[in-house]
Amino acid sequence: MGDLPGLVRLSIALRIQPNDGPVFYKVDGQRFGQNRTIKLLTGSSYKVEVKIKPSTLQVENISIGGVLVPLELKSKEPDGDRVVYTGTYDTEGVTPTKSGERQPIQITMPFADIGTFETVWQVKFYNYHKRDHCQWGSPFSVIEYECKPNETRSLMWVNKESFL
């Protein structure tokens, strides 16, 4: 096992396919468990891009709400300080969220040697007939996380989450 990095920076980007369209979120205030809701469309595919710093870290998959998304190494950035992985998250068969409700979905990403990244996203899944609702709110390019691995190498503490 290598040295435990002091900080791990990772970003997760979602883009609806086939046109690499933006994903939106809405600020809900304190009405629900979290103040931001990510809007997703059922029966759709999303490109998932994960960037990780330091570039020595390796990951094979991300679980989004229990759906395992295999990640493929895409590149190491030219300056060599980040590594980029991509995969496809499919919402086929996901039940639309009822009106006035939100769904917490668990996000997990197990890293070799340093533990598992875990967080929860508050999501609203819309069906095709309400697809225009998915585009109300603010688009985001990426969700960035600053994490600290714990000493037992079992999980990472999330210090900061930013929607950019």
Swiss-Prot record:
Origin superkingdom: Eukaryota
Coiled coil (UniProt feature): none
GO MF annotation: an example: type 1 cannabinoid receptor binding
Pfam family, one: CNRIP1
Quaternary assembly: Interacts with the cannabinoid receptor CNR1 (via C-terminus). Does not interact with cannabinoid receptor CNR2.
Role: Suppresses cannabinoid receptor CNR1-mediated tonic inhibition of voltage-gated calcium channels.
Name by which UniProt lists this protein: CB1 cannabinoid receptor-interacting protein 1
Gene source species: Macaca fascicularis
